[in-house]
Amino acid sequence: MVGYEPLVPTTLPSRLVSIAAYRWKLWKHDGVKTRERTVLITGGTGSFGSTTAQKLLRSESLHEIRILSRDEAKQDDMRRRISDPRVRFYVGDVRDFRSVNEAMRGVDYVFHAAALKQVPSCEFFPQQAIATNVHGSDNVIRAAAENGVESVVCLSTDKAVYPINAMGMSKALMEKLAQAFARNNPGSETVVSCVRYGNVMYSRGSVIPLFIEQLSQGKPLTVTDPGMTRFLMSLTESVSLVEYAFENAQPGDMFVRKAPASTVADLAQGVARVMGVEPDMRVIGSRHAEKLYETLLSVEEVSKAEDLGDYFRVPLDARSLDYGLYTDEGSPGLDQGQDYNSHNTNRLSVDQVADLLMTLPEIQKLVSSRAK
């Protein structure tokens, strides 16, 4: 974001403009001291939480990072790995409002990353997906509002667009909760927004570590569907997306980062190429409720989206529930365009996939160790 100036919205009340300016300063490392802030990351022991925490710890405006998660073993691992007294851990579950509320007291900003994310698991246990991704998200938003939190950024997924699986449906409802809060509470001091992204390479649950393990053991690469496409984003880019939303969001906004895509077959070939292996490939068929391609913005969202260079912003539909408007006046016509999906975005070749993989620290370390 070189040369980028945050879009502090002049249409917001002066109180929210001031909040937006403070949000920007949290991420700046220019020696300018502002009031120290406290950040809560739900589900913070995962890949996103660890990377975000390490970045925030470089800020002059940080007072404390709170990590709320269920797994005390992962918390202990993270505590040893980061070893900074400004990181404080809370064992709790977003499903339990009391534990969320306790962690929320005195917090200025929230990054809501806690979720059930595995598509097959959510298909077999949809009630658990609802409990965490829907009711848990509602607890986070409600506790944030009750404690005067200034900004909440909710992490969503491309599977929330045209959802066909329980995971995507539950995430779509999380987005609706965030938008409904913004629409129904226009005077709230809490700005709730969402970000939506696709596959984060080498994050927990990514297929890339599986491919590496299979190649290391001399096994064939198991590919669900060779023509299946997925968006590809690095962990650093996913954190930058949240940072961008944090700096710029108006109530109810949705932000998406533009991203390239690859077929599953080309991704597998790219992993094999960086490892210097000629792979055998075995097609095993798609898993429960998987799509051939994923969508980051629907046709309807594209028609309203603001193009911000590397990002899209979809503003909140802030109309009131006045039925007369729907029956008498209606809404403006929608553009007859297309959605933004992993089939029509920039498609990477095998060579380009390999080059992209080589930007990941985990792959660089792996290649270096194999060269010794």
Tell me what each language-model feature is.
Residues D30-R37, E146, K176, A180-K372:
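Strand-loop microenvironment adjacent to phosphate/nucleotide-handling motifs in alpha/beta enzyme folds
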Residues V39-L57:
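N-terminal Rossmann NAD(P)H-binding glycine-rich loop of SDR-like oxidoreductase domains
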Residues T42, M104-A113, C154:
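Rossmann-fold scaffold of SDR-type NAD(P)-dependent oxidoreductases
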Residues S69, V91, A131, D225:
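Conserved residues in the N-terminal Rossmann fold of short-chain dehydrogenase/reductase
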Residues R88-Y109:
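Conserved Rossmann-fold cofactor-binding substructure of NAD(P)-dependent oxidoreductases
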